[in-house]
């Protein structure tokens, strides 16, 4: 047979067919790869999108962990409330005006604003009112049922509740509208106190309407862990009551601070900044004078004043503020000099009209001349000139070393927020003779009230610097203990014999010196007064009246520090104004804790020593 030759058109057809086949295979391969990518690699993404279109999730807020005092008093809990939301899509159009009018009346909302919200038919969710009480929620529910209004959701919620009101407010702090901690323990332990929210999933259709035959799945919320504090509610009551009276009686302008500590463990048994505020209504200015000042203003000035007043009342002055400790600090200077061997308890000093240091003249309060004195007498008389000499014998290097050893250059480490990162002080390379002189009797340095209290604990407890703390236990939701927190000794600051000598001197101050108003019948008390000048104040007469007392001083257990910032009374002397507050708080505490009245101490005296008269306090010339 003759050979059949392929024509050009036939060969062209075959080439086109092969090209189409290759293209078809490539498309199929691409589709297969894309299908694999969609179904295997990104299946979770599209499943989530589908679930988002088909399900509505409603968060069920978890309760925060509860907070208890050391003696079991409930300080912070949770109360039920209801959050109201609307789905305008689900609301019958003919009911919009009625719904806006009725709900505005029940919830005290703007009717026009509600009408605008309900008229937006594209909206599937809008907030009406956060956390209303049961009465308001029931009223809304009844109104909607009576008028056949759909699209209003009433979700159960939870909010923080402080059953004791303003009690311990500066320590507890408070939470915001989202139940997150804003201040105090609520902020410091926010992660621990915050529980795990639950959720309810409800089926919806393509337009966002809840399906009549829908299903719900639920994950229950888990309450956060709780706290048990070192704060004893009885001692806290003693302190708050005594401070409140002192603030009113002596017209204290810049708030008062009180701290009660266990000198041997660092546990804070009571802490108060007065006036306080109600953490249930933290934005309401509790102090009458501050509130009147704000209300007298208008516009931006009023807004700024309100913010300042709120920030001030929320601030835990005992932890966050720095102050000039004044003559209370002489305990630190004396202890350091004794411990370093710069002086002995038999050393003597002379106090004349004044003392000159590098051309600057210093004098004692009211220009008193104490003459020749022992160390104990210098402490009893709160003699500035003697302590300038003691500081000089100690020297700036040793002074600064002990200042640091007492923890006065660093945060105490207390488990509360907003503690200053450092105090204001002179380092050895910046401290000249004048600075050393003024620092030796408690001026020119600024430390926190808590630092001062912790340092005095070390003076009397055998020389151990203990870390202050306010939380003793972490609790599970059922009340069982998860973790027991133990006292922390930061370091040994003084020899035990130095501490013993200091206790004897502090006892003499209360028996014979400027601390007579801290005497408690039947108990031995040691202490030291202070009347410090506020060097950074525009008011040259501004003073801080303070007193620190320890009882029983022969077996130290409790320390009480009371500071009245800018009192306006017949005197500004700490021995007159603050010492009686310490005595009242400590006497009640000792009786409450069952400490027997082992001695017949002299009755309290109202006599004042010249060293603590209000004329000049701890002021000095030329500085």
PLM regions with names:
Residues 76, 205-216, 263-328, 332-564, ...:
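Beta-lactam-recognizing serine transpeptidase/beta-lactamase-like catalytic domain environment
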Residues 1-297, 313, 322, 397-407, ...:
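Periplasmic/cell-envelope proteins involved in peptidoglycan metabolism and beta-lactam response
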